[in-house]
Amino acid sequence: MEKVKAKKQYGQNFLKDSTILDKIIQSMPNNNNHIVEIGPGLGDLTKNLVKYKDLTAYEVDTDLIGILKSKFAIEIEKGNLKLIHTDVLEAWDKLKNLHDGKYDLIANLPYYIATNIILRAFEDELCEHIIVMVQKEVAEKFTAKTNDKEYSSLGIITELISINSKILFDVPAEAFDPPPKVTSSILYIKKDMSKSLDKDFNKFLKACFIQPRKKLSKNLTTIFDKNIIFEIYKELNINDNVRPHEVSSSLYSQMYTKVKNGRNK
């Protein structure tokens, strides 16, 4: 069969290293959850996942859909694999949930939409575990804590929505075909299924970090009324000189609740 060329517009880098594939399988939680895979590519991870659990895979590339249907004809016929040809973000817009029961997201994500996919998985109340391949710098942002250099809105949201988050291991460029120009990491997040976040909370955090090295109050008063921010600082005993990376996730949550009760400029 003619070699399939990766398409840049879909951010395709096919994971081929069997050792890495095995390590991903070993990291799967021991539960009865369904599995959702986004961007199965040529099916190298899919082949391993479907041995253990039923699987729903979302693929946007028409050429790859044909290959996957042929490669997994038996699994599809048996009902072990459901292959959906669509853009996964559009699917989330229409369906709200990627599966009709509790599921774990396990995938080698395209770099260019990885952050958006993880944030949507946070919103999906049926998604419990997230085990995904992403660019190392992205994984570090999702797992960063207060005062870390990489600390941003992503780390804050992750800390508030999860029970556990960590980088399991790094993956070198040579594990892929074609090799990307960056190091990748496997990011693991176990969500706290009792928690959910206000959709506008992320917008609030982005405003807080719009100039990350400036004082937090400076960032906030460009969007919100100065008197409201002053009162919130006073109520929560926040130092006026504090920078965005020095504030804990729980304090950001308290600030947001109070800002919601105030008024925009």
Curated annotation (Swiss-Prot):
<dbReference type="InterPro" id="IPR023165">
    <property type="entry name" value="rRNA_Ade_diMease-like_C"/>
</dbReference>
<protein>
    <recommendedName>
        <fullName>Ribosomal RNA small subunit methyltransferase A</fullName>
        <ecNumber>2.1.1.182</ecNumber>
    </recommendedName>
</protein>
<dbReference type="Pfam" id="PF00398">
    <property type="entry name" value="RrnaAD"/>
</dbReference>
<dbReference type="GO" id="GO:0003723">
    <property type="term" value="F:RNA binding"/>
</dbReference>
<feature type="binding site">
    <location>
        <position position="59"/>
    </location>
    <ligand>
        <name>S-adenosyl-L-methionine</name>
    </ligand>
</feature>
<dbReference type="InterPro" id="IPR020596">
    <property type="entry name" value="rRNA_Ade_Mease_Trfase_CS"/>
</dbReference>
<comment type="similarity">
    <text>Belongs to the class I-like SAM-binding methyltransferase superfamily. rRNA adenine N(6)-methyltransferase family. RsmA subfamily.</text>
</comment>
<feature type="binding site">
    <location>
        <position position="39"/>
    </location>
    <ligand>
        <name>S-adenosyl-L-methionine</name>
    </ligand>
</feature>
<keyword id="KW-0489">Methyltransferase</keyword>
<keyword id="KW-0963">Cytoplasm</keyword>
<comment type="function">
    <text>Specifically dimethylates two adjacent adenosines (A1518 and A1519) in the loop of a conserved hairpin near the 3'-end of 16S rRNA in the 30S particle. May play a critical role in biogenesis of 30S subunits.</text>
</comment>
<keyword id="KW-0808">Transferase</keyword>
<feature type="binding site">
    <location>
        <position position="13"/>
    </location>
    <ligand>
        <name>S-adenosyl-L-methionine</name>
    </ligand>
</feature>
<dbReference type="InterPro" id="IPR020598">
    <property type="entry name" value="rRNA_Ade_methylase_Trfase_N"/>
</dbReference>
<keyword id="KW-0694">RNA-binding</keyword>
<dbReference type="InterPro" id="IPR001737">
    <property type="entry name" value="KsgA/Erm"/>
</dbReference>
<keyword id="KW-0949">S-adenosyl-L-methionine</keyword>
<keyword id="KW-0698">rRNA processing</keyword>
<feature type="binding site">
    <location>
        <position position="87"/>
    </location>
    <ligand>
        <name>S-adenosyl-L-methionine</name>
    </ligand>
</feature>
<dbReference type="InterPro" id="IPR029063">
    <property type="entry name" value="SAM-dependent_MTases_sf"/>
</dbReference>
<dbReference type="InterPro" id="IPR011530">
    <property type="entry name" value="rRNA_adenine_dimethylase"/>
</dbReference>
<feature type="binding site">
    <location>
        <position position="108"/>
    </location>
    <ligand>
        <name>S-adenosyl-L-methionine</name>
    </ligand>
</feature>
<feature type="binding site">
    <location>
        <position position="15"/>
    </location>
    <ligand>
        <name>S-adenosyl-L-methionine</name>
    </ligand>
</feature>
<dbReference type="GO" id="GO:0052908">
    <property type="term" value="F:16S rRNA (adenine(1518)-N(6)/adenine(1519)-N(6))-dimethyltransferase activity"/>
</dbReference>
<dbReference type="GO" id="GO:0005829">
    <property type="term" value="C:cytosol"/>
</dbReference>
